[in-house]
Design a protein with these regions (language model features):
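Alpha-helical transmembrane segments in multi-pass membrane proteins
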Residues: 12-20, 42, 46, 50, ...
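Short loop segments and helix-boundary regions at transmembrane helix junctions
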Residues: 25-108, 204-216, 233-235, 259-261
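Loop-to-transmembrane alpha-helix initiation sites
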Residues: 9-12, 57-65, 84, 88, ...
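Transmembrane helix-bundle core of multi-pass membrane transporters
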Residues: 7-8, 77-79, 87-147
């Protein structure tokens, strides 16, 4: 018989996998994995804002991550720095500022390891509600913008020429990334949330023949990562968040055999 805390963790993990699957595919297609890292690092500033102002942590993380995302999009247009330099600048600067602020708040106790790596086994009913309702909103918005977003991924200039306003949908997509980071911070932490986005999508890309297959397999990969990771953490007493990411890595490694078979068939 599973304990209540484990069932809650499963419900949260399943909800996350359903959302990170489609989002992760778009991240992989658009080569935005480091962009996700930047938003995740900036989330630490949102955490400190939550502690200092006593507002909801998910809300403060969402606000800060969204601001950083929009600043980054603006800087990409107005500076000559390459995107990877801007990403590194904002990622490490925001992380450093967040850690400095934590150091200055000597009267407030922080679970820094929990913030960085998460603790999905400590979630409560409110977290389940947040993940499922927040995730549903993210998926609805993603469904609405999916066609122009996908078109701009394939050919940005053509999408712009057809009046699809790709920059507008890029901004909306980055805000969706900020939203999934905000609702997932307690579960897998700041440093591992990008793994939930990238690993299932990367695995799915290896075994898929078209974009829709990739989305479906990415969701399945995320669900398997959650199930394998959580049960493994329960059996061998390992941290739950890192165990989920490790399970995703193992699935990715297994998917490489499909690439090898494709290569052999082509030869």
């Amino acid at each position: 018989m599973l304990d209540d805390f484990f069932i809650r963790a499963l419900l949260v993990g399943i909800g996350m996998a359903l959302v990170t699957g489609p989002l992760g595919c778009s991240v992989v297609w658009r080569r935005l994995s480091f962009f996700g890292d930047t938003l995740a690092h900036s989330a630490l500033l949102g955490v400190t804002l939550s502690y200092t102002t006593e507002i909801n942590m998910a809300l403060s993380v969402f606000v800060i991550s969204s601001i950083v995302a929009l600043i980054l999009l603006k800087l990409q247009k107005t500076t000559n720095l390459p995107s990877d330099a801007l990403l590194g600048l904002l990622a490490h600067s925001s992380l450093a500022i967040g850690l400095v602020v934590i150091g200055l708040l000597a009267t407030i106790r922080f679970d820094l390891m929990g913030l960085l790596f998460g603790d999905i086994l400590a979630v409560n009913v409110n977290d389940i509600i947040l993940v499922w309702i927040g995730g549903a909103i993210i998926l609805i918005v993603l469904k609405i913008i999916w066609k122009p977003l996908f078109a701009s991924t394939v050919n940005f200039e053509l999408a712009e020429a057809e009046g699809m306003k790709p920059e507008k949908y890029n901004a909306i997509f980055t805000i969706l990334l900020a939203a999934i980071i905000a609702i997932s911070i307690k579960m897998v932490g700041l440093l591992l949330i990008t793994g939930m986005l990238i690993l299932p999508a990367a695995m799915a890309r290896n075994i898929s023949d078209n974009p829709m297959q990739m989305v479906i397999f990415s969701v399945i990969g995320g669900l398997l990562s959650v199930l394998i990771g959580l049960f493994a953490s329960l059996e061998i007493n390992t941290p739950s968040g890192p165990s989920i990411i490790t399970a995703g890595l193992l699935l990715f490694i297994l998917s490489l055999s499909r690439i090898k078979k494709k290569t052999q068939l082509n030869n």
